[in-house]
Amino acid sequence: MAPKVALFLALSLLFAATAHGCEPNCSGPVVPTPPVVPTPSSHSHGRCPIDALKLKVCAKVLGLVKVGLPQYEQCCPLLEGLVDLDAALCLCTAIKANVLGIHLNVPLSLNFILNNCGRICPEDFTCPN
């Protein structure tokens, strides 16, 4: 009986050492890379860096036009690469210039489009006159 116990203990120690002893071949813990946050565009100086006429497709996000691709597939890519403040500024420009072809409640429409594109309208933001 004693040889069986000794063999059991020896094998247990061997397996424990093998499981914890992978030092040369073990990879370290995976450290996630921080998300890339675009820097505010310094070239816009209070102007939309994209053509406001292209934002006409954003009327689809409001559910007012239903033709072709799903609403977000045309509007949201136009806002990619812009920080939330620049995206809000561009949409304000489009809404106020009536390039969407409809009269809208600016704050509600702006928030709705930004939220549907995964953006957040800055709390203290108001569309410039």
UniProtKB/Swiss-Prot annotation:
Record key words, sorted: Glycoprotein, Repeat, Signal
Ranges occupied by Sequence repeats: 29-34, 35-40
Presence of keyword Glycoprotein: yes
Family: To carrot DC2.15 and PEMB3.
Protein purpose: Delineates a novel subset of developing cortical cells. It is probably involved in some aspect of transport of molecules to or from the vasculature.
Glycosylation sites: N25
2 X 6 AA tandem repeats of P-V-V-P-T-P, as annotated region: 29-40
Tissue expression: Cortical ground meristem of developing roots.
Organism: Zea mays (Maize)
Signal peptide feature range: 1-19
Keyword Hydrolase annotated: no
Spans through the membrane: none
Protein name (record): Cortical cell-delineating protein
CDD domains: HPS_like (cd01958)
Superkingdom of this protein's organism: Eukaryota
